């Protein structure tokens, strides 16, 4: 901490700073200390190496499923929810510096921050979960809808598309995009109070962007009938999205879709959707596809999902 500004660095570069039990415990303890220090007004979160945070620790999930200890996964995720909720509701102004990859849980962590700075040509965001047999369980299905709207949440989570810095900014996942040389100045401007918090809830920042328009049209009402029925006469963009979706885990798609809808329906009480994410964990981690998909990540092999 220096001059009221706390700097937090996730330092597991060998694991791309993935969240595990130890990291969640450390973050919780550190955050409690910052909240209790009245001199702290800003916190800057960064990752060491090439990633901000590349999701949760996959081996932890596989080990717990194989040992029939899914309760431990739920407990870990509940603790993750607690600290992410604390960061989101904090009096402290928070800045996520996303100068590399932010995947899954890392993107979910960043979405709890007031400011999310990306670097042009370097920042890449993605929710890979439905492609590995699970769904974003640290608030991703809910905060994506709050930040970017239902259609962009479906594009990001259900289809699992990569988001470069410009698209992520147009959607709202990033609040600032700068060249690498301008990164420290952008951070300084926020610390000095020269940047207002963005406010465009439940819709993308730039709905007039050409790609955003396609996303709004493709992932609006009736998207399942269009994209999951190969005989429906799809255009090139829709056909690509359909291919992404049908290779993902069916139960993951179904549950993620339902959670995204809950986020849209419970705007007055976001806690409803966050609890729904937690309530579905036992179901999703008990599927054969979850173990298949998570093992596939560790082995580096593409897998086929059975829908079980």
Outline where the language-model segments fall.
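Glycine- (often His-adjacent) and acidic-residue-rich active-site loop
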Residues: 47-82, 102, 131-133, 305
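Hydrophobic, secondary-structure "cap" segments at the distal end of domains
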Residues: 141-151
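Amphipathic alpha-helical segments at domain termini/boundaries
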Residues: 1-11, 15, 158-277, 283, ...
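Glycine-rich beta-to-alpha active-site loop
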Residues: 83-132, 136, 156-165
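Conserved CoA-thioester-binding segment of acyl-CoA-metabolizing enzymes
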Residues: 1-48, 71, 85, 220, ...
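Terminal peptide-recognition signature
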Residues: 8, 12, 26-27, 45, ...
């Amino acid at each position: 901490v220096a001059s009221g500004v706390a700097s937090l660095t996730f330092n597991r570069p060998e694991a791309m700073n993935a969240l595990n039990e130890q990291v969640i415990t450390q973050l919780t303890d550190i955050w409690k200390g910052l909240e209790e220090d009245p001199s702290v007004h800003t916190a800057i979160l960064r990752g060491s190496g090439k990633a901000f945070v590349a999701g949760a620790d996959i081996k932890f999930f596989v080990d717990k499923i194989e040992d029939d200890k899914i309760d431990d996964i739920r407990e870990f995720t509940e603790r993750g929810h607690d600290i992410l909720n604390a960061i989101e509701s904090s009096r402290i102004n928070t800045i996520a510096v996303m100068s590399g990859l932010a995947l899954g849980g890392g993107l979910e962590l960043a979405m709890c921050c007031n400011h999310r700075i990306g670097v042009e040509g370097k920042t890449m965001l993605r929710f890979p979960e439905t492609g590995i047999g699970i769904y974003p369980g640290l608030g991703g299905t809910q905060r994506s809808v709050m930040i970017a709207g239902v259609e962009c949440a479906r594009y990001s989570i259900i289809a699992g598309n990569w988001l470069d810095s410009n698209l992520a900014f147009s959607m709202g996942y990033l609040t600032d995009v700068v060249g690498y040389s301008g990164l420290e100045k952008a951070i300084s401007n926020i610390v000095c109070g020269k940047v207002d918090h963005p406010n465009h809830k439940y819709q993308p920042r730039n709905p007039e962007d050409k790609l955003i328009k396609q996303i709004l049209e493709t992932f609006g009402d009736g998207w399942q009938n269009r994209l999951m029925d190969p005989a429906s006469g799809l255009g090139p963009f829709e056909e690509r999205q359909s291919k992404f979706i049908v290779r993902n885990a069916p139960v993951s798609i179904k549950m993620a879709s339902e959670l995204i809808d809950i986020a849209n329906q419970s705007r007055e009480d976001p806690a409803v959707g966050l609890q729904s994410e937690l309530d579905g964990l036992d179901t999703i981690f008990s599927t054969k596809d979850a173990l298949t998909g998570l093992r596939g990540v560790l082995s580096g092999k593409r897998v086929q999902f059975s829908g079980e």
